[in-house]
Structure formats: structure tokens, C-alpha cells
């Protein structure tokens, strides 16, 4: 759902997908092939949010800021289920793990990976290609070329999802009884741990 706030209205590219159960308010720009999942809240009431092309904001993520701040989610960034980004900048092709929290004025360098449940403190600057994890978050190693390839392949699934949702997602009613259903499109993508 899109909401105007004091004359500020969201922009959503026609090739992006914002789930009807997401909440996008005010000064928010959402570009091509962006997926915004159900339960996501993007509050551009006090500042601005920019979601660049090919990024995704998954289910139950929250993006907000202190007044006058711009939150940048750069091209190809991947915000996992339930993460919170408050007044931070997320670089190109970054992966933010599920339920991670990224605080004000933190800067996440491109091709970095933030582990699930991590807490990135305010003003922390993470260089490009770093794996970060923990509470408080610490840099634990460099991101390999193989990790970047794995992350990029996963994000490509989400970059195709807006078109799929526009074409195939529709409200329905429950089946009267369970039946064996198979998605004809088998996707061979798995966790990093299982690939190594």
C-alpha cells in the first residue's frame, strides 16, 4: 500500500513490485526490478529512501531514519527477511542477513555480507567485500569471488520476481483438502554452506 505524507508521495517504477501488504509512505523512490515483500515498512516521512534497481526488501523489513536523512539501498542490494535499516547506507550488491539491524550513519561497502541477527552500530563503516557478523558486529573475513557469485545468483531470483508477481500472484481461496502441488519451475539454488 502506498501512502502520501504531507504532500510527499512515493515513486514506484512500473517494473518494480510492491506487495499490497507492504507499507510505503512519503518520500520513497523504488526503481526497476525491485521487489518489496509483504509486511515491509518503508517510512519516507522524516527523510528520503532510495531503493535502486534490482534491490530487494524482503518480508517484514523496516527502513526509517532520523529527520533529514536519506537512506540509500544501492543497486542489487539484498535485505533479508525481518532486517531493520535505520538511517544507514547500503552499498551495491550487499547482502543483509535475516533480522540484522543496521543503525544510523552506518555505511556498508559494496559486495559485503552482514550475517543474520547481526547488530551494526551507528556510524560503523564497513569497507567493500567484508563478511560481518555478531552483536556488536565485527568484520570476520573478506568476501571471496565465489561468495559474490553465490550472492549475485540469489539476488537474480529476486530481480525476476517482480515480473512473476505481476503476472502470476493473485488472491485465492483455500483448497477444500490438501493435494500434492509442485511448482513446475524448479530452482536449483541453495545455502552458502551447502554449496561449499
Predicted features along the sequence, with ranges:
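A positional/architectural concept
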Residues: 7, 12-65
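Glycine-rich hexapeptide-repeat left-handed beta-helix
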Residues: 1-11, 45, 53, 59-61, ...
Amino acid at each position: 500500500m502506498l501512502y502520501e505524507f504531507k504532500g510527499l508521495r512515493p515513486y514506484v517504477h512500473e517494473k518494480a513490485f510492491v506487495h499490497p501488504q507492504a507499507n510505503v509512505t512519503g518520500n520513497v523512490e523504488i526503481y526497476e526490478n525491485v521487489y518489496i515483500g509483504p509486511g515491509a515498512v518503508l517510512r519516507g516521512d522524516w527523510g528520503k529512501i532510495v531503493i535502486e534497481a534490482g534491490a530487494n526488501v524482503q518480508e517484514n523489513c523496516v527502513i526509517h531514519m532520523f529527520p533529514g536523512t536519506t537512506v540509500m539501498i544501492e543497486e542489487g542490494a539484498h535485505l533479508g527477511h525481518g532486517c531493520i535499516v535505520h538511517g544507514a547506507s547500503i552499498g551495491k550488491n550487499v547482502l543483509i542477513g535475516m533480522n540484522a539491524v543496521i543503525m544510523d550513519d552506518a555505511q556498508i561497502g559494496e559486495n559485503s555480507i552482514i550475517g543474520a541477527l547481526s547488530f551494526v552500530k551507528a556510524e560503523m563503516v564497513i569497507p567493500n567485500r567484508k563478511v560481518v557478523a555478531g552483536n556488536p558486529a565485527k568484520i570476520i573475513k573478506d568476501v571471496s569471488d565465489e561468495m559474490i557469485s553465490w550472492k549475485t545468483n540469489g539476488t537474480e531470483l529476486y530481480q525476476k520476481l517482480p515480473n512473476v508477481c505481476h503476472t502470476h500472484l493473485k488472491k485465492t481461496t483455500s483448497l477444500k483438502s490438501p493435494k500434492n502441488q509442485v511448482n513446475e519451475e524448479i530452482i536449483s539454488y541453495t545455502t552458502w554452506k551447502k554449496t561449499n
